[in-house]
Every structure is written in structure tokens, then in C-alpha cells.
């Protein structure tokens, strides 16, 4: 629910920013068109089969509301907490999207939660808190000047999340709750992509050869021109 409200908040904020800051008068041109890779942070190495339902729930968060629906969606693979996904693992995530799109009526209706006191209230809270964060960034001189501050806040947020999980305050199934489990056929190193070290060595050699043979003067000139244009 909160993830869906975040998308609704983004949509409302973008509409207002486009109208007030940039003077865009056409409501269609102010639509928040976004693509999203849903969060992989919540995927767990323990009981990785639980990651499937986590991925489905995250997909619903960015597709339930028509007015704030992602225009493109990428889902992580169930085993990304274990290692690199194989093509079959990536296909599984693709099939999740296809089942949601073509075997359900998820896309058949408009704003499902329009008028809900819970949804509207939470969305308003998120808009207010997000605007406060945006004001802080603008006060620091914009996104570029605020990079260090934003990185610091991200690290602090992640640290706090880990503290809550380790203390049991935030429940994560299979990690700090309901940890008993039957043996899973999905665990172990056999269920991740293994890259031949020779492939890595060949790629490094190809990159080194390309760098050795490129026209460095042309590269430097192009970078200088790019910097000049960016500063104008």
C-alpha cells in the first residue's frame, strides 16, 4: 500500500512542479512517465523461495494505480541475494509480469483506490515529507551539491533498517521469524549463474586492447567539448 502511495505522491508532485516551475499547461505533458526496477534490497538469502511473493507484491505497488502506473517495469530475479541470476531465473520474473498483465484484470480498471481515506491520507503524508526533503536539497544548492548529504542519509537509513531487523523490530520471514524450514531445492551454488574465469580474463584483455588502440587525443577533445557545452 505504501509503495503504491509513493507512486501516487510522485505523480502529484511532478504535475505540480511541471506546472509551477516550468509553466507546462498541458496536463497530458505533465504526466509522470517513469520506469522502475523494483527494490532488490528486501530479497533474502535465507529461504530464497519467499522472494517470489516479495517480487509480486513489489510489482503490484507500481501497477495497481492507473494514474501512477509505471510505464516500464523490471523485476529482479528470485535468487539475486545469492548471486547472478541465470536466464531461466530472469525469465521467471518476466513471466510474473506477463501473468499479471494478461491473466488478471489488473490493467482493466482506472484509479482503484481513488477516494479511499487511507490511500489519500497516506499519499498526502508522503507528499509533505517528500517536499520537505526536496526543499532541503534545493537549500543545499540542488542535487549535485547535495550528493554527499543524500548519500549520508541513504547510508543512515540502511543502517537503521538493519538495526530494526537485527533487533527483531522489523520482521523478515525466514531471517528473524519463521526460520524453521524444510530443505529447499532452490538453495546452494548450483542455482546461480557461474561465469567462467576465462570469459572474465578475455573481456579484460579486450578492454585493455581497445584502450591501447583508441585515439586519446580525440577522446580528450570530445570530453573537453562535452564539458564546455554542459557549462553553457
Task: Put a short name on every predicted segment.
Residues 3, 7, 89, 126:
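Charged, low-complexity surface patches
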Residues 10-11, 15-25, 53-67, 92-104:
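Structured alpha-helical segments in the cores of large, soluble enzyme domains
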Residues 24-26, 62-64, 136, 163-166:
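A general structural signal for short secondary-structure junctions and capping/turn motifs
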Residues 33-37, 51-54, 61-63, 72-74, ...:
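Structured core elements
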Residues 36-49, 55, 73-88, 105-123, ...:
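Short beta-alpha connecting loops at secondary-structure transitions
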Residues 91, 95-232:
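Catalytic-core signal marking the mid-to-C-terminal active-site face
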Residues 27-33, 62-72, 99-103, 194-199, ...:
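A glycine-rich, aromatic-flanked flexible loop/lid motif
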Amino acid at each position: 500500500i505504501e509503495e503504491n502511495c509513493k507512486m501516487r505522491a510522485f505523480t502529484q508532485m511532478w504535475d505540480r512542479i511541471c506546472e509551477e516551475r516550468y509553466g507546462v499547461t498541458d496536463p497530458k505533458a505533465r504526466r509522470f512517465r517513469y520506469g522502475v526496477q523494483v527494490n532488490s534490497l528486501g530479497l533474502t538469502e535465507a529461504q530464497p523461495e519467499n522472494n517470489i511473493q516479495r517480487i509480486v507484491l513489489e510489482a503490484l505497488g507500481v501497477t495497481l494505480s492507473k494514474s501512477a502506473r509505471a510505464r516500464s517495469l523490471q523485476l529482479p530475479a528470485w535468487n539475486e541475494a545469492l548471486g547472478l541470476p541465470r536466464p531461466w531465473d530472469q525469465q521467471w520474473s518476466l513471466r510474473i509480469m506477463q501473468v499479471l498483465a494478461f491473466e488478471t484484470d489488473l490493467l482493466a480498471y482506472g484509479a482503484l483506490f481513488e477516494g479511499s481515506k487511507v490511500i489519500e491520507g497516506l499519499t498526502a503524508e508522503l507528499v509533505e515529507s517528500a517536499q520537505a526533503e526536496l526543499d532541503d536539497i534545493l537549500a543545499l544548492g540542488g542535487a549535485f551539491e547535495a550528493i554527499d548529504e543524500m548519500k549520508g542519509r541513504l547510508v543512515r537509513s540502511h543502517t537503521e533498517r538493519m538495526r530494526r531487523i537485527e533487533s527483531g523490530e522489523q520482521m523478515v520471514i525466514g531471517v528473524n521469524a519463521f526460520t524453521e524450514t524444510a530443505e529447499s531445492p532452490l538453495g546452494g551454488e548450483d542455482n546461480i549463474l557461474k561465469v567462467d574465469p576465462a570469459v572474465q580474463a578475455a573481456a579484460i584483455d579486450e578492454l585493455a586492447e581497445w584502450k591501447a588502440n583508441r585515439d586519446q587525443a580525440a577522446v580528450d577533445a570530445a570530453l573537453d567539448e562535452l564539458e564546455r557545452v554542459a557549462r553553457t
